[in-house]
Regions:
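Short amphipathic beta-strand starts and helix->beta connectors
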Residues: 20-29, 73-84, 114-118, 161-171, ...
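Acidic, low-complexity central loop/insert segments
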Residues: 32-34, 41, 86-220
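Residue-level signal for inorganic ion chemistry
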Residues: 46, 96, 134-136, 183, ...
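Glycine-rich, small/acidic residue-mixed loop/short-helix segments
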Residues: 4-8, 78-80, 230, 235-241, ...
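Acidic, proline/glycine-enriched N-terminal capping motif
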Residues: 2-82, 88-89
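Short, solvent-exposed amphipathic alpha-helical segments in soluble enzyme
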Residues: 57-62, 110-116, 148, 197-202, ...
Length: 340
């Protein structure tokens, strides 16, 4: 028996990291499933639902038809980020999928903007609906084996299928930008659905592995990359923004930043030579150029996310993060090119 608790701790961490690497590989080139049931789910209904969401977020909801969907960013009146969400357009409702730590905040924020003449209703259905993310290159094959052959459909398009007696809404795409699908069903049927998928070999993604994937892909998270310190253009969420739809909350600031090429900092990945605390200052030649917002051990190294001043440089820039050497790298989920 080992008398030194640190030896046991280090051995446990090695085994844990090895397991996470196996899960990460499955999520990319194989198949893996993540239980996202605690992510917020808000039903927006009644006559003005599309116009309401159109006016409250960055995406063009009024052009969307039932069976379609889109990512959108909810921002403050000064275009500071609240959350990155997905809207699935149903026949008579819109199902908003939002971050777990923004569920209550976003519901109350939306409710505050429903005025007397608006025909809009909100309902939090997080506790009645389960959701899963099935990801990886082999995820389509698993769904095909379950009787759901899905091919060549647009991102976020969705429809209802039956899997082992369970009614499941399957949407194209994942929260991470990896190949895969989001699956939504009644909570009381979720165990059956989960078992059907894992029986076909999908690895289970736990919260630690999910956080590693999130950082590696560069998906921003509320209270880390999405805060009132940053706007959607700094985050790199250009594809969630309609520049042609007219007024919405925060639109004036976003339009001005785009028109005058005024984005002063960008979210990047940071490849680190060692561990460093979140919140550490990013410097170049002793001058502060940014801040580290997330960090984890991934793919045998340390990766982080952080904001860096645009004038300092981008991919390939050598930096110090605290007292640790680092290099700015690209992250797949975001982009930083102004539209043509």
């Amino acid at each position: 028996m080992c008398s030194d608790p640190n030896v046991y701790k280090n051995k446990y961490m090695e085994n844990s990291n090895l397991n996470i690497q196996t899960i990460l590989q499955s999520a990319r080139s194989g198949a893996a499933i993540y239980d996202s049931s605690d992510w917020g789910k808000i039903l927006v209904s009644d006559r003005d639902r599309l116009r309401f969401l159109h006016n409250q977020s960055t995406a063009d909801f009024e052009k969307r038809l039932a069976g379609e969907g889109c990512d959108t960013v909810f921002v403050t009146s000064t275009a500071r980020t609240i959350d990155l969400a997905t809207g699935l357009i149903l026949d008579d409702e819109v199902l908003l999928l939002c971050s777990p730590n923004r569920r209550e905040y976003l519901f109350n924020w939306l409710d505050r903007y429903i005025f007397f003449a608006d025909r809009v209703k909100l309902k939090d259905v997080t506790d009645t609906l389960a959701s899963f993310t099935l990801m990886g290159d082999e995820s389509a094959g698993i769904l095909a084996q379950l009787g759901c052959p899905i091919t060549d459909l647009p991102q976020h398009s969705h429809q209802v299928y039956i899997i082992d007696g369970v009614e499941v809404r399957i949407a194209i795409g994942t929260e991470l930008g990896l190949p895969g699908y989001r699956l939504i069903c009644d909570r009381d049927k979720s165990a059956t659905l989960h078992q059907s998928i894992t029986n076909l070999g999908a690895a289970i993604v736990d919260e630690d592995a999910w956080e590693c994937l999130r950082i590696a892909q560069g998906r921003p998270k509320p209270d880390a990359e999405l805060t009132e310190d940053y706007n959607p253009l700094e985050v790199g969420l250009w594809d969630t923004i309609s520049f042609a739809k007219g007024c919405y909350i925060g639109q004036e600031t976003i339009a001005r930043l785009n028109t005058y090429r005024g984005v002063k900092q960008y979210l990047w990945g940071v490849k680190l030579a060692g561990s460093v605390a979140v919140g550490a200052t990013i410097t170049v030649d002793g001058e502060k150029v940014g801040v580290l917002t997330s960090c984890s051990q991934i793919d045998g190294g340390i990766l982080g996310l952080g904001y860096v001043r645009s004038k300092a440089g981008g991919v390939g820039l050598k930096v110090m993060v605290g007292d640790v050497e680092g290099e700015i790298i690209n992250i797949p989920f975001v982009r930083h090119e102004y539209p043509v």
